[in-house]
C-alpha cells in the first residue's frame, strides 16, 4: 500500500473550516487552521511539519491593524513567518478578498491587493509557491457573493 502524500494546512479560519478530507481524500491532511488568527499565530507556529507539504493562508484578520506606515514591517514579518514553517514544499495563498461594508466599498480589497503585491515581491527568489487567486475571487472589486458563505469565508465553489 502506498503512503498518502502528507499535507499540513496552516493559517486562519479559511484553513480551519476547509473540509480537507472531503476535497482531498487522496492526501493525509493535518489541519492547523485557527479561526480569528493571523500573523502572530504563524510567527509562533511550532508544529513539526518538516515531513509535509504545507499550505498556508492568513492575513485577513490582521487587515484593520495595518496602515500605510506599518505595511512594510508587516510584509517583512509575514514573509519571515512563512519561511520559518518547516516543510518539504510550501504553498502560500494570497490574502483573500473580503466584503466588509454594506455600501459595496472596494477599499479594503484595494488595500489587500497592495499587500499581496508586496508579499509576492518579497517572496521572489525563495522556494515558496505563491498561489495568487485574488482576482479569481473578485466580482466588481468585491468578493464574489457566489463564492462566499458570509462575505468573508469561501464556500465549496470558492
Where are these regions (language model features)?
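Charged phosphate-binding loop/patch that engages nucleotide di/tri-phosphates or the phosphate backbone
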Residues: 1, 157-158
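Alpha-helical cap/lid subdomain in secreted, periplasmic
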Residues: 24, 43-157
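Serine-esterase "nucleophile elbow" of acetyl-processing enzymes
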Residues: 1-53
Amino acid at each position: 500500500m502506498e503512503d498518502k502524500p502528507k499535507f499540513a494546512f496552516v493559517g486562519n479560519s479559511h484553513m480551519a473550516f476547509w473540509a480537507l478530507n472531503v476535497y482531498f481524500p487522496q492526501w493525509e491532511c493535518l489541519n492547523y487552521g485557527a479561526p480569528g488568527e493571523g500573523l502572530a499565530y504563524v510567527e509562533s507556529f511550532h508544529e513539526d511539519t518538516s515531513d509535509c507539504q504545507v499550505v498556508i493562508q492568513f492575513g485577513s484578520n490582521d487587515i484593520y491593524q495595518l496602515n500605510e506606515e506599518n505595511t512594510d514591517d508587516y510584509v517583512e514579518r509575514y514573509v519571515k513567518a512563512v519561511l520559518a514553517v518547516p516543510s518539504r514544499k510550501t504553498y502560500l495563498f494570497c490574502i483573500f478578498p473580503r466584503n466588509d461594508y454594506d455600501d459595496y466599498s472596494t477599499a479594503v480589497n484595494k488595500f489587500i491587493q497592495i499587500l499581496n503585491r508586496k508579499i509576492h515581491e518579497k517572496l521572489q527568489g525563495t522556494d515558496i509557491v505563491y498561489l495568487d487567486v485574488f482576482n479569481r475571487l473578485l466580482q466588481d472589486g468585491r468578493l464574489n457573493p457566489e463564492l462566499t458563505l458570509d462575505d468573508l469565508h469561501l464556500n465549496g465553489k470558492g
